């Protein structure tokens, strides 16, 4: 959480922090919201910790809704803009593909996060 920028949506790599010009990864934020909410529902956290993490997940989800969600089918071919899945760095050999676009897992976790936010989630696993 310490590496997240003010809008709570991480850069494509958590080594970057506030003020970086690197692209954001909305799909990582959507997956993180689901993971945080799952962690909070499984026990093991003190009430204060659980409240903190639920609030952080809520802030992250609100940012996705307000700043990253597609608002028109004319705008994009998915639900959540600004996802990343292949970004080059000194530590890998990939080409920049899938930077700043919608992706399948971002859309899936975004829908799951919205569902978890609206009602008690009953896992199907």
List PLM regions with ranges:
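Glycan-recognition and catalytic cores of secretory/periplasmic carbohydrate-active enzymes
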Residues: 1-125
